[in-house]
Amino acid sequence: MRGLYVHVPFCLSKCPYCDFYSERYSRALGERYKEAALRNLRFYNERFDTVYFGGGTPILLAREIVGILSEASLTAGAEATVEANPCVSDEERLFLLFSGGVNRISFGVQSMREEELRFLGRRHTAKQAENAILCAYKAGFRNISADLMIGLKNQTKASVSESVRALSSLPITHFSVYLLKIEENTPFFRDGVGVMNDDEAAELYLFTAEFLEKSGFCQYEISNFARTGYECRHNLKYWRCEEYLGIGPSAHSYYNGKRFCAARDLNAFLKEERQEITVTDEAAGDFEEFAMLRLRLTEGLSFADCARFGISAETLLRRSEKIPSEYLRVTESGISLTARGFLVSNALIGRLLGY
């Protein structure tokens, strides 16, 4: 069954490292956005088992999100996620979301150290992040995720472990860990902000992965860790090459065998009967794409899956012979990358694909 992604492109302010499409939040636009999203959704006679509201800062439109959910066709037990910034995650919004059908909340915490939060241009403090998480739990959420940013210049293992300890003492069930990357057309890029060198960043990534594992969060994807049973079902669709529909400015879709994206234009989305899309791949889902996505997961690539594409286990094993075991696991049923292998995944995947 397909998943639904809804891009909510509103923020109070733009973080200096972020290159996702967003516009300044205006309460007056909320109702218009909801109607545009529903208008587009009605073009598809679909039932979804996951829905993910990403942004932007979707929680700003809590009431509108509940309105969209009330009209969307979801299966019983569907996973419904909303991304949230701790500084606007008040009791009213969180209770409204949970009572309206949202059962998973993802907080953009990034760090529990004040100096790192200031550097990243975040509007919240560590205390606000803690309060937001506890408030979400009080509202009824039992599936709570936190984003963590690593690779900041001068960041240390001690500072990362401080953030992980602080967050894992709270009712968190999931972590997404991202290495800071300086993207073009961001203030960090224009200001020449530096990041850790590759070797330091790799060492910090491996440390963080190990520390999270010891704290009870199992790695299931390059950047994602979860307590047992709390993996993000929606995001697993991306990595398992399953189809999903994207609604909203800049939203991407994999639908009916094609990949396409919506225009990065809020005004057009609000005005037009149907969102403008650009097809990026007419025949998505070939073996190369499938393998690249599956090898992001610790479950890896099974020989049975390869056989569906006409790739034999013998071919894959032959290509993997010279890859050291510290980078690649080989079992009777398939292959997968280790945490160290994830750091050089592009090179390893290229070798496995026969490049």
Model-derived segments and spans:
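Short, amphipathic alpha-helical interaction segments positioned at domain boundaries
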Residues: 340-355
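Immediate flanking context of iron-sulfur cluster ligation sites
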Residues: 1-8
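A short, conserved structural fragment
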Residues: 324-333
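Local cysteine-cluster metal-coordination motifs and their immediate loop/turn environment
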Residues: 9-20
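Short, flexible helix/strand-to-coil boundary loops that buttress conserved ligand/catalytic motifs
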Residues: 19, 121, 349
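Short amphipathic alpha-helical interaction segments
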Residues: 310-324
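C-terminal scaffold of the Radical SAM
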Residues: 1, 22-44, 49-311
